[in-house]
């Protein structure tokens, strides 16, 4: 059975924290690859102004293109409405019955697991992998595999705020992503 990691998110923008988490879990669990799963509309972010799918996808491609064990999975982008992990993983497990999926989540999402849509059924489809995130614990009533990663306190919301305030984001996200953001005037207001 193949072992594949999945890291979902809006990736608005993708940053070194996402890449660090994916790479650390890839090595710690001896995965075949890690798939980045950009959301259409995450249920917990409905109503927030999210950068276009096209721009988020382009930035994610730029961020991951140099790692042969990273891929982008477009499963959620093909659907309209909220992106529920259960629906996505049900589709992916049907398409790839030979794969054991390891769904990678940060401490913020570990704490939120009791509120996830169809969590009990989702546990039959994936192994959750929790990684520590500053300010959050990995305590949950659900079974998760934990992977220790070096602390890197950066988030997409922090980066959007820094761009809005015209502060440097150098060394926080890949240079190609920075160039794309600046050329397209993203996060300026």
Curated annotation (Swiss-Prot):
Pfam families: CTP_transf_like. Its EC number is 2.7.7.18. It comes from the Bacteria. Keywords: ATP-binding, NAD, Nucleotide-binding, Nucleotidyltransferase, Pyridine nucleotide biosynthesis, Transferase. One of its GO terms (molecular function) is ATP binding. InterPro entries: Cyt_trans-like (IPR004821), NadD/NMNAT (IPR005248), Rossmann-like_a/b/a_fold (IPR014729). Pathway: Cofactor biosynthesis; NAD(+) biosynthesis; deamido-NAD(+) from nicotinate D-ribonucleotide: step 1/1. GO terms for biological process: NAD biosynthetic process. Belongs to the NadD family. Catalyzes the reversible adenylation of nicotinate mononucleotide (NaMN) to nicotinic acid adenine dinucleotide (NaAD). This is Probable nicotinate-nucleotide adenylyltransferase. It comes from Bacillus cereus (strain ATCC 10987 / NRS 248).
């Amino acid at each position: 059975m193949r072992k594949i990691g999945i890291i979902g998110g809006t990736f608005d923008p993708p940053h070194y924290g996402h890449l660090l988490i994916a790479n650390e879990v890839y090595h710690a669990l001896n995965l075949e690859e890690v798939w980045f799963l950009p959301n259409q509309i995450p249920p917990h972010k409905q109503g927030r102004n999210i950068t276009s799918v096209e721009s988020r996808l382009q930035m994610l491609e730029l961020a991951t293109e140099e790692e042969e064990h990273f891929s982008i999975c477009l499963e959620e982008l093909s659907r309209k409405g909220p992106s529920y992990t259960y629906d996505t993983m049900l589709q992916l497990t049907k398409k790839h019955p030979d794969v054991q999926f390891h769904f990678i989540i940060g401490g913020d999402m570990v704490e939120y697991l009791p509120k996830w849509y169809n969590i009990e059924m989702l546990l039959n489809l994936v192994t959750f992998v929790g990684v520590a995130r500053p300010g959050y614990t990995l305590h949950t009533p659900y079974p998760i595999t934990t992977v220790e990663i070096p602390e890197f306190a950066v988030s997409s919301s922090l980066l959007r705020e820094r761009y809005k305030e015209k502060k440097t984001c150098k060394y926080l996200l890949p240079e190609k992503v920075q160039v794309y953001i600046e050329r397209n005037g993203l996060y300026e207001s």
